[in-house]
């Protein structure tokens, strides 16, 4: 559901529960764009899960919960400053970065180019950056792509408005 819900519904979704399934669409600012860069490497979800810790510190759990709450409030309010402060993954990113060559340089390039925040998309290897406006998103996508190219890693870059509609039929012929 964590991958299917956003694809079907579009934008951001919060899965509050899996049993029973409780999916909540979350509004976001009209000018929020995402730059997605997919490096030409294979990364199995099982390998990405294997590097995660089975236990987290109490402080990291509290901080991650606060970041998640801040992220959701920032989306709903359109508060880019809060969004920037809330885009810190303390649970997965510190361990999964080792699986994506050049990730730290890529993230730095994204932030330097104007991204609100940058992280690993799902279990990777794709990297996403949230940006205020399409122009900045295209600049960020270019900066990330160049950072991957610099270490010899081919990649594909995509830019999309975040609150785009979900899956829909555009032509039924």
Question: Residue spans of the language-model regions?
Answer:
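Alpha/beta catalytic cores of group-transfer enzymes, especially the acyltransferase/condensing modules
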Residues: 1-32, 118-120, 128
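Glycine-rich, charge-dense phosphate/pyrophosphate-binding loop(s)
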Residues: 75-173
